[in-house]
Amino acid sequence: DKLTESRKQTADKFAADVKKQLEYLDMPKINFVVDFKKGIMSSSGIDKIEFLISANPGEAPKPLAKIASGGELSRIMLGIKSILAYNDTVDTLIFDEIDTGVSGRASQKIGLKLKEVSKNTQVICVTHSAQIASNADCHFLISKDVSGSRTFTSVKQLSRDERRCELARIMGGLEITDAMLNSAEELLQTNFGK
């Protein structure tokens, strides 16, 4: 009972901290709950713990694993990892398309949060967002080519100028214009001052 009570107190603070992180990541209406149920007694106690969320006011929280989209799961994981980053022993975090279904403003916040987490843990992020990619210390371009009946994937580390061109390409359209290149440069200047 003491262990359960201690966990519940910690869980309340943890849930409040996660909610703050998710509000920052443009999920302002989310309700995040740590749910406790009695399980089978083991060496780690009797508690069976599950994360529940409701993305909209008035909805009852439901199991995170069942209702969250891929983009929501990535942002929730990022929020949790940003809280645990200083105590976590994970060497590398991988986020695949964390930008799915989010606005440019949310992408910028996600990029900043990823940069913050990367101070303590290596972060690999696959993204289609210039706002997120512009925060990276190192930028790789992944491309697929079909030759005959085979598909080949290539990975290339981008130079500073190639990076600016790639950010402009991500931002926009069939032709890279001077305005897009200037916007890409501004993102890099804002994030790195160079």
How would you describe each model-predicted region?
Residues 96-97:
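Walker B catalytic acidic pair
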